[in-house]
Amino acid sequence: MGKKEQVEQLTTYMANFVSYIGKVLPDDIKAKINELAEKEDSPLSKVIYQTMQRNQVLAKELNRPSCQDTGVLQFWVKCGTNFPLIGELEALLKEAVVKATFEAPLRHNSVETFDEYNTGKNVGKGIPTVFWDIVPDSDKCEIYTYMAGGGCTLPGKAMVLMPGEGYEGVTKFVMDVMTSYGLNACPPLLVGVGVATSVETAALLSKKALMRPLGSHNENERAASMEKLLEDGINAIGLGPQGMGGKYSVMGVHIENTARHPSTIGVAVNVGCWSHRRGHIIFDKDLNYTITTHSGVTL
């Protein structure tokens, strides 16, 4: 297969993948929704979870997006330097989004700032957003695909703390965000927390945390312990499904961190709603693929 045919093939694969994740939730998210539905005991909570579950069934049966807000497309690309299409990836991902927009279909969610017009294709300046991790001497390419909806994006916040505020300050920041904005972000939520030096590094980490599978933990024992403490604390707020009250407010809390400057603690929060539409696909150099987030899928 020549390079032109490879580009066309990968574009089609990614367009189909984007379309699919807008309609079918990842396996771990579906399992968590079912788990929380069993654990909640209030009649209203159970009705809401039953509605969520029914929504997923209908989305797949009718081949329609599971939420009308199909978000802005964001891609985390972990690509080997020897992957044959590394130089074509950004352009073909943009083309894949356009293709998916009309085939899925996806709601038109790309508004050019300052000019204030909708492009009608879900692409624009900097959209879709592509974040890169380059892997030396590898010929594989991993792509995390995420639909960033408006409701779950609104609570996003970042700031830099004085070092004396410590991890108590990080906890207070996260809890302040959740008590102020979590209600309207379509809980139960997946909460991503980034801890680093500055606002931009912490913010990127907090979004990257949302790509992790449910049930995973930070490799640092102290950070993993903080994930559990924050999860328990946010659940105690009692947001419940759709903010209507209940025992469980979150599907999980994921912390990603780097080393930091001794004089600062950068912290950020990003959240994913109950309809957490993310996908993870791995390509080898011949474009054979493995999908880790959704079982039984053929593109």
Residue ranges and their predicted role:
Residues 1-299:
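Non-transmembrane, aqueous-exposed alpha-helical and coiled segments at domain scale
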